[in-house]
Amino acid sequence: MAEPITLARPYAKAAFEAARDASALQSWSDALVEAAAITRDSKVKALLSSPSLTAVQKAAAFIDLCGDTLNEAQKNFIRVLADNNRLPLFPQVSQLFELYKANQEKAVDVELQTAYDIDDAVLAKLATSLTEKLDRKVSLQTAIDPSLLGGAIIRAGDTVIDGSVRGRLAKLAETMSH
């Protein structure tokens, strides 16, 4: 069976194109994030996997759970997912949608892990440097991980730059063992 992210891709692409064409990227993003959160609830998971409910009933129940925040196109999107038994894929659809949206907006979320706290001036300089290197607007999130020993790990999309002492020691150990 295919991976959930693979199954979600055409739906995320369709949602993104509909949102882009309607100039409603943020509205769709908010709706998909909310739908993904609803889908993660254990009672909702049971409802969505219930064989006694039809696709129409599942869609109606899901739309009710979303409240009044959905527009008609978003409700129709939910109905299409229900018709194809894909409502449980909302977390993956939302994840892919955010990726497409970031590409459209030429933005990227960058995660910076360091062994120690870094001052704001260094973070600003790093963000500027990454913006130039990646040719995208950078949103920098930081996390402290003392197990890195020193240095940093930078994750931007599917790119990882490991400049940590822990990473260098692991490479050295691997080289010495061969």
Curated annotation (Swiss-Prot):
Domain of life: Bacteria
Family: Belongs to the ATPase delta chain family.
Transport keyword on record: yes
Subunit text: F-type ATPases have 2 components, F(1) - the catalytic core - and F(0) - the membrane proton channel. F(1) has five subunits: alpha(3), beta(3), gamma(1), delta(1), epsilon(1). F(0) has three main subunits: a(1), b(2) and c(10-14). The alpha and beta chains form an alternating ring which encloses part of the gamma chain. F(1) is attached to F(0) by a central stalk formed by the gamma and epsilon chains, while a peripheral stalk is formed by the delta and b chains.
Gene3D superfamilies, alphabetized: N-terminal domain of the delta subunit of the F1F0-ATP synthase
Membrane disposition: Peripheral membrane protein
Cited NCBIfam families: ATP_synt_delta, PRK05758.2-2
Subcellular location: Cell inner membrane
Biological role: F(1)F(0) ATP synthase produces ATP from ADP in the presence of a proton or sodium gradient. F-type ATPases consist of two structural domains, F(1) containing the extramembraneous catalytic core and F(0) containing the membrane proton channel, linked together by a central stalk and a peripheral stalk. During catalysis, ATP synthesis in the catalytic domain of F(1) is coupled via a rotary mechanism of the central stalk subunits to proton translocation.
Name of this chain's protein: ATP synthase subunit delta
Record's GO cellular component terms: plasma membrane; proton-transporting ATP synthase complex
The keyword Membrane appears for this protein: yes
Keywords: ATP synthesis, Cell inner membrane, Cell membrane, CF(1), Hydrogen ion transport, Ion transport, Membrane, Transport
Lineage: Bacteria, Pseudomonadati, Pseudomonadota, Gammaproteobacteria, Cellvibrionales
Pfam families the record matches: OSCP
GO MF term set: proton-transporting ATP synthase activity, rotational mechanism
